[in-house]
Regions:
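Cyclic-nucleotide recognition modules
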Residues: 33-95, 103
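Regulatory nucleotide-sensing modules
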Residues: 1-17
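Short beta-strand segments in beta-sandwich/barrel cores
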Residues: 2, 19-24, 42, 66-67
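Amphipathic, well-packed alpha-helical segments that form the structural scaffold of globular domains
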Residues: 96-99, 103, 122-130
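Phosphate-/nucleic-acid-contacting segments
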Residues: 117, 124-182
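A residue-level structural signature of the nucleotidyltransferase/glycosyltransferase Rossmann-like core
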Residues: 12, 34, 67-68, 142, ...
Length: 182
């Protein structure tokens, strides 16, 4: 993990390569994946705009990653100095990413409230098919996702995710084997 709840907040990260996930964790160790982020995305940007002493979520690498980091304090100094001409463009890019995440989170909250587990899994698999680390396959799109990870994405148990995948496979909607879903 790059950071965990309770860790000091004071750094903005930029994903140069690889993929990371943001995860909310409950006291009983249950986890909900809030989102995946890849190359070209900022992570940990909240502290630029609201004061917070500590992190509230987990930032976990999903693959080999290269991350750039800069302290909020140093970035604010650069905005007042050498980066002043580019500050509005950079802040707009960060704001745009935050807006997309808010939209994604709103959709996820709606799904949790209004859809059953089966529909949440189908929609989540559809969303994952649009991610950069999905692969083209003769029968559609190949995803590499464990049942545990899928459960964390949709807010259900690993067993329930497995049952739904099995039913979807029986219905001919997809093919699942191990961590591979087509």
């Amino acid at each position: 993990d790059v950071f965990r709840p309770g860790d000091p907040a004071g750094t903005l990260y930029y994903v140069i390569s690889g993929s990371v996930s943001i995860i909310a964790e409950e006291d009983d160790d249950r986890e909900l994946v809030l989102g995946y982020f890849g190359a070209g995305e900022f992570v940990g940007e909240m502290g630029l705009f609201i004061e917070s002493d500590c992190r509230e979520v987990i930032l976990r690498t999903r693959s080999a990653c290269e991350l750039a980091e800069i302290s909020y304090e140093r970035l604010h100094q650069l905005f007042q100095g050498p980066l002043a001409p580019d500050a509005s463009r950079l802040l707009y890019a960060i704001g745009s990413q935050i807006s997309k995440r808010l939209l994604h989170t709103s959709r996820k909250a709606s799904r949790l409230a209004f859809l059953d587990v089966s529909d949440r899994i189908v929609r989540t698999l559809h969303d994952l098919a649009g991610e950069p680390d999905s692969m083209s396959h003769p029968q559609g799109t190949q995803l590499r996702v464990s049942r545990q990870e899928l459960a964390r994405l949709v807010g259900c148990s690993r067993e329930m995710a497995g049952r739904v995948l099995k039913k979807l496979q029986t219905d001919g909607v997809l093919h699942a084997r191990g961590k591979t879903v087509v």
